[in-house]
Amino acid sequence: MKPKGRIVGIDYGTKRIGLAMTDPLQLFASPVGTFEPGGLHHELRRIMQGDTVDLAVVGSPVCDDGSGNAMTAVVDRFVEELRAAFPDLRVERVDESHSSREASRILAASGKSRKVRREKGRLDSAAACVLLTRFLEENRG
């Protein structure tokens, strides 16, 4: 049986991008950090040099009625750029509905002070963790 590679989760934003990654067995997700849009490709290349990455899941904004919004088109362009930059990497979109809200609740429940929770990027990487965890739970087999 071929060993699994890691999966990266990406919470894309125009100002910051949250990144999370699974363990090698794809059992759980951990935050990697937050990056400016221009620095994400460099970070992904760095990760892929040290680890086998099988898949990237990108949070895609979906309205409650299932339709997209203005940010959906931005994420679609990002996904195409990601596929062009990493042609061997499988990329899938996942519904990111309420991932930031859920991440905010998780950070609050963790006992972190409000000041720490408000640090730039902490919420973004936690949201990437949430969407990656959802993906893992939905695809356990």
From Swiss-Prot:
Biological process per Gene Ontology, one example term: rRNA 5'-end processing
The Swiss-Prot or TrEMBL record annotates one GO molecular function as:
nuclease activity
InterPro entries reported for this sequence: RNaseH-like_sf, YqgF, YqgF/RNaseH-like_dom, YqgF/RNaseH-like_dom_sf
Instruction: Output a single Gene Ontology CC term carried by this record.
Output: cytosol
| Annotated keywords | Cytoplasm, Hydrolase, Nuclease, Ribosome biogenesis
Show the CDD domains listed in the entry: YqgF
Could you say which enzyme class this protein belongs to?
hydrolase
The record's subcellular location field reads:
Cytoplasm
- Where the protein is mainly located, per its record? cytoplasm
**SMART domains named in the record:** YqgFc (SM00732)
* Keyword Nuclease included in the entry's annotation: yes
Pfam families given in the database record: RuvX
Write down the EC number. 3.1.-.-
Annotated function: Could be a nuclease involved in processing of the 5'-end of pre-16S rRNA.
Q: Which family does it belong to?
A: Belongs to the YqgF nuclease family.
What is this protein called in UniProt?
Answer: Putative pre-16S rRNA nuclease
